Amino acid sequence: MGFTPSRYVPDVWYKLREDGEGYDYIATYVDDFLITAKDAWSYMRHLQSVYTIKEPAHPEIYLGALYTGQPSQDWTISCKNYIKEAITRIEHQYGTLSEEKSPSIMGDHPEQDDLTILNNEQHREYQSLIRMVQWLVTLGTLDICYAISSLSCFSCCPREGHITLLFRVWGYLKKFPNKSIGICAQDPVYEEPLEEFRADFEDQYEYASEEIDLAFPEPKGKPIATSIFFDSDHAHDTETRQSISGVLVVVGSTPVSWMSKHQGAVATSTYSAEFCAMRLATEEAITIQYMLCSLGIPVNEPTKLCGDNLRVIQNASMPEATLQKKHIA
């Protein structure tokens, strides 16, 4: 059919449309595939002439996520079917879950739990429950990302308090199973002016330029904006004094990637922890820019990094700023 695998996302194939205004895509995963094209059914009929296709239709469920919408409307992604089926299984095995208003308790520190270590059977059950909810985070239930990242650290040796907190997460999902992510390609609107952070680094880096892979397809279609929100919790882990970084990647106005993880170094200050989180956000910015470019999507503007520590942003954005390195671990 003339499709080419993306250089950086080999499971996604692209093909230039006949009008030359954009690309059609086919995403594959094991024996599932998803077609995004102006005339998707023409490709589907071609595939049906060669392969046996099971239940071809507009996307409803893909990899466990529920897609709601029509080709001419905005789409949403939710995990409500997966959540309801999982909760039915859990309640059949463990009893009725109590509904919770939040996935975790404010100020909770699972690393301080000193209750009894789970036995081998309970240990396996804990790992099974963690894997199920980790897949939900991957599919789009990002509001439990921090809680699950924290509890996943104890998969090797969980205690009774940890499994209690894990059941709390499932209780939260039981109360709010219908949350979804809206897919919107419109650029986000920023309330604060960004001109003061639009510094020109050409004076300091006269010969610097962005590396462009020559194997990338020619950008076609409407340019899209990328933004990354980041934050840190300094010395959150009371045992190791490690800080936690949180990152949310947004393409257009749609969240596409998120993470909550311990920082590799022990930050000696809030400033240092925020800078480490910004470094992680910068790595994600490079990744998402290359991914979009490898699919032929125009990205004409730098990725905007949004944080809540003005001093960190100023030191990273302004060439004339003096970075006080003694405060960074």
Q: Language model features by range: what are they?
A:
Residues 1-329:
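Long, low-complexity, charge-biased intrinsically disordered regions
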